[in-house]
Amino acid sequence: MTDLTSLTLAEARDGLANKSFTALELTDAHLEAIERARVLNAYVLETPAQARAMAREADVRIAKGEGGPLNGLPLGVKDLFATEGTRTTACSQILDDFKPPYESTVTSQLWRDGAVMLGKLNNDEFAMGSSNETSRFGPVVNPWRRQGSDAKLVPGGSSGGSASAVAAGLCLGATATDTGGSIRQPAAFTGTVGIKPTYGRCSRWGIVAFASSLDQAGPIARTVRDAAILMHSMAGHDPKDTTSVDRPVPDYEAAVGKSVKGMKIGIPKEYRLDGMPAEIEKLWTQGAGWLKSAGAELVEVSLPHTKYALPAYYIVAPAEASSNLARYDGVRYGARVEGRNIVEMYENTRAKGFGAEVRRRIMIGTYVLSAGYYDAYYLRAQKVRTLIKKDFEDCYAAGIDAILTPATPSAAFGIGEKAGADPIEMYLNDIFTVTANMAGLPGIAVPAGRDAQGLPLGLQLVGRPFDEETLLSLGEVIEQAAGRFTPERWW
């Protein structure tokens, strides 16, 4: 029998439909794989009893010829999504053993469509990080290794657990969130596919907030088709989220394999950075060549305000975080550290409950929102954000269908490798991805090649608002040309 954990989500769906195996067998295979791969630290909570119960229910539906599009398919859930009655901590000590009394909209839609929950996945604390090293549960290990080395590498962040689990065959797909690149960067580091949908496409209700005007939920999967299948269930209007957009959800899977002939692909000159590694430059050129061979037209474009995106992002995001994280005070839920009075209790709780990176970002955010600096920093960053959005609008108005860029400035680096470095060095990992968040646009990261040490590298496509379908069509061209990427099992 085929190793059930090596199947794509689409293959598993077809296998269940033609009764090659049961949902329970599929779920058990993944639960066993999770047990064998605990060294990766991808899961912070395993839910085997719940998973088996959901799988049995799926098998009953299959026997009756009923069930939704994800019936019996085992998924992992980033620990940022509220799961009713199941511990949700955002991988922070301050949320301690919090069990939400409600389910996030995105996960409730997955369960509505028949998916099975295997457990909660590790992430950077409150989704703040680019390496999954800030989690209270410890770092996630990338299933990929450099050739000839057993050094542990980061999977990227903040959705490192999601990316690592998908790459290692510990789930068929996973939920993730992207505030400045937290879906696309881990996908690029692990040889998986990650989609950050248009802002407002997927509900944010029930997702622990980092920066509300930037956060967006999306899937990480093994293939473009798998990501499209998950997107269909995750997307949709939600009246509980005021930023959710009421427009029909298209058949994303139908876009996979569609011709890209005649599409105009923008190649932004500002993304050619000083000191860019030659292999990233080569990968980008190669990806553009694949799209051209498929019938697309390449056009050099200008996004002149790109150079301001990263500094503006690191003003806007911490400002929103300092506001969102003000609610964690130890009064109603989560951890509480007593003090002589209520103010001291707040201070003790927040000092002990938040990790160093979260404290750093709260302090930056509070500083830029303070009376003396609001105009100089926050207001100016919001103006820059408008200019970044206009750069993209001008490109699309000129007939560009999507923009092709590298996904990351390098392949995965070692755990602890940047621990003593200036935090800005870590923030530079987001250099190619933050613009899509600042402009609210959809982006996809697709594996496109490997570096000299055998590690996966990804390319990014950024599209028009609510045109994820074009990204899926283009992404599949790159996927077909580059082939599938699977790490060699060492765990």
From Swiss-Prot:
Q: Which residues form the active site?
A: 78, 158, 182
Its cellular-component GO annotations read: glutamyl-tRNA(Gln) amidotransferase complex
- Give the EC number: 6.3.5.7
Question: Sorted alphabetically, which InterPro entries does this protein's record hold?
Answer: Amidase, Amidase_CS, Amidase_dom, AS_sf, GatA
Q: Does the keyword Protein biosynthesis apply?
A: yes
Tell me the keywords, alphabetical order: ATP-binding, Ligase, Nucleotide-binding, Protein biosynthesis
- Show the catalytic activity: L-glutamyl-tRNA(Gln) + L-glutamine + ATP + H2O = L-glutaminyl-tRNA(Gln) + L-glutamate + ADP + phosphate + H(+)
EC supergroup of this enzyme? ligase
What's a Gene Ontology MF term here? glutaminyl-tRNA synthase (glutamine-hydrolyzing) activity
Could you tell me which Gene3D superfamilies the record lists for this protein?
Amidase signature (AS) domain (3.90.1300.10)
Q: What are its GO biological-process terms?
A: translation
Q: What does this protein do?
A: Allows the formation of correctly charged Gln-tRNA(Gln) through the transamidation of misacylated Glu-tRNA(Gln) in organisms which lack glutaminyl-tRNA synthetase. The reaction takes place in the presence of glutamine and ATP through an activated gamma-phospho-Glu-tRNA(Gln).
The entry's family comment says:
Belongs to the amidase family. GatA subfamily.
Q: HAMAP family of this UniProt entry?
A: GatA
* Complex and partners: Heterotrimer of A, B and C subunits.
Per its record, how is this protein called by name?
Answer: Glutamyl-tRNA(Gln) amidotransferase subunit A
Instruction: Name the encoding gene, please.
Output: gatA
